[in-house]
A protein has these predicted regions:
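Conserved class I S-adenosyl-L-methionine
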Residues: 52-60
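Class I SAM-dependent methyltransferase SAM/SAH-binding core
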Residues: 57, 65-101
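Amphipathic, non-transmembrane alpha-helical secondary structure
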Residues: 40-43, 47, 64, 68, ...
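N-terminal, positively charged/glycine-rich alpha-helical extensions of SAM-dependent methyltransferases
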Residues: 1-23
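Flexible, glycine- and charge-enriched loops at secondary-structure boundaries
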Residues: 7, 32, 80
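Class I SAM-dependent methyltransferase Rossmann-like catalytic core
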Residues: 26-29
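Conserved alpha-helix/loop element of class I SAM-dependent methyltransferases that forms part
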Residues: 32-52
Length: 101
C-alpha cells in the first residue's frame, strides 16, 4: 500500500511531467508506441456495440493519449486524472484538435 508521502511524490511528478504527454519522443514515448495495441484491444472489447452510442470514462487519463482516438471514432469520452496539469494538457491538446472530451 502506498503511503501519503509516496502519493504526494507521485502527484508532484506527474503534475511536473504534464508538458511531456504529447511529445512522442519524450518521457511518455512508450505510451505513444503502444497506443495502437491498446486501441485494438479496446475496440475488440466493444466490437458488438456502436461506439457512437458509448460513453467512455478514462480514469488516469494523463494528457488524453487514449481519449482522443476514442473521441475521433465518435465515443463520448470523459477523462479524469489526479494531476490538474495533466487535465490542462489534455484539454489544450483536444481543443487544438477540435475534439470534445
Amino acid at each position: 500500500m502506498m503511503n501519503i508521502k509516496s502519493k504526494n511524490e507521485e502527484f508532484m511528478l506527474f503534475n511536473q511531467l504534464s508538458d511531456e504527454w504529447w511529445n512522442e519522443n519524450g518521457k511518455f514515448k512508450i505510451l505513444h508506441q503502444i497506443k495502437s495495441h491498446r486501441m485494438t484491444y479496446i475496440l475488440d472489447q466493444i466490437k458488438n456495440r456502436d461506439i457512437k452510442n458509448l460513453k467512455i470514462l478514462d480514469v488516469g487519463c494523463g494528457g488524453g493519449i487514449m481519449c482522443e482516438p476514442l473521441a475521433r471514432l465518435g465515443a463520448k469520452v470523459t477523462g479524469i486524472d489526479f494531476a490538474p496539469n495533466n487535465i490542462k494538457a489534455a484539454k489544450i491538446h483536444s481543443k487544438n484538435n477540435k475534439l470534445k472530451i
